[in-house]
């Protein structure tokens, strides 16, 4: 639905930018939003290479327009935003914050300030076609570096308050570079690198089989007793994986519990 597409693309865009901020190629960042609204929970996973994937709990949610616009906050509802950073340590870092507006950008800004103690401004927007498909999505994350002067901070805050919405900038055909130039105005801008983004799912039959094994011997035995192949679907890319009874027996033998 258009509501699910709008909310999901905002989260995908934010997640892609946050993933690009991770340091090592093997690092993985996940942004989860769990609200009590009709859209259900949403998950986005990204890495520093610009690869991103995600899924929506209820992609078919239909909501009436509010003042002629989609009401993102109503779709998401009240809930929690979680950011999970897997950087190869024994346990991943997990930061949880409440959803303050449920409009994604404000919630990510709040997360950065409260969980990472980094003053930030996040803007996100989605440009929809008349047939409710997404034409493009975009956004920005601006963070202060240590040593920023009060004068610079005041100037930046004033500028952010007066800029157009990201959706309006996309509608005007602005590129990411032009969006940054528009936001920063006469403040100095140096572009150090650009990273193309793309949807990428790393699921495979082997990875899915490990997930099946993780349910334990008792559950796998029930599947074997049914005497029929099982089909497992990937939430992220909707790929289908079929396991025969013989394959289930092999997975049963691999179970440790």
Segments the model singles out, each with a brief description of its role:
Residues 12-16, 105-109, 209:
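Predominant activation on well-ordered alpha-helical scaffold segments within soluble catalytic domains
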Residues 9-38:
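N-terminal low-complexity or amphipathic/hydrophobic leaders
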Residues 161-257:
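Cys/His-clustered metal-coordination modules, chiefly Zn-binding fingers
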Residues 50-54:
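DNA polymerase sliding clamps and clamp-related checkpoint/processivity subunits
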Residues 92-95, 105-187, 191:
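Short helix/strand-capping turn motifs
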Residues 55-117:
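Hydrophobic alpha-helical segments and helix pairs
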């Amino acid at each position: 639905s258009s509501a699910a597409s709008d909310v999901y693309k905002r989260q995908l865009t934010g997640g892609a930018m946050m993933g690009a901020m991770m340091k090592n190629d093997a690092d993985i960042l996940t942004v989860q939003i769990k609200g009590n609204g009709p859209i259900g929970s949403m998950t986005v996973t990204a890495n520093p290479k610009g690869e991103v994937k995600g899924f929506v709990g209820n992609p078919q949610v239909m909501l009436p327009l509010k003042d002629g616009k989609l009401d993102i906050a109503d779709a998401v509802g009240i809930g929690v935003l979680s950011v999970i950073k897997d950087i190869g340590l024994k346990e991943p870092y997990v930061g949880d914050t409440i959803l303050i507006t449920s409009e994604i950008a404000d919630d990510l800004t709040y997360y950065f300030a409260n969980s990472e103690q980094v003053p930030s401004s996040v803007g996100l927007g989605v440009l929809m076609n008349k047939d409710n498909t997404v034409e493009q999505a975009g956004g920005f994350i601006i963070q202060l570096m240590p040593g920023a002067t009060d004068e610079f901070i005041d100037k930046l805050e004033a500028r952010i308050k007066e800029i157009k919405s990201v959706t309006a900038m996309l509608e005007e055909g602005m590129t990411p570079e032009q969006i940054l130039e528009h936001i920063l105005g006469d403040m100095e801008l140096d572009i150090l690198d650009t990273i193309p983004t793309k949807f990428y799912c790393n699921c495979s039959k082997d990875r899915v089989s490990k997930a099946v094994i993780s349910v334990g011997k008792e559950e796998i035995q029930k599947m074997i007793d049914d005497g029929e192949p099982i089909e497992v679907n990937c939430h992220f890319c909707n790929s289908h994986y079929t396991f025969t009874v013989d394959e289930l027996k092999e997975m049963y033998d691999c179970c440790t519990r």
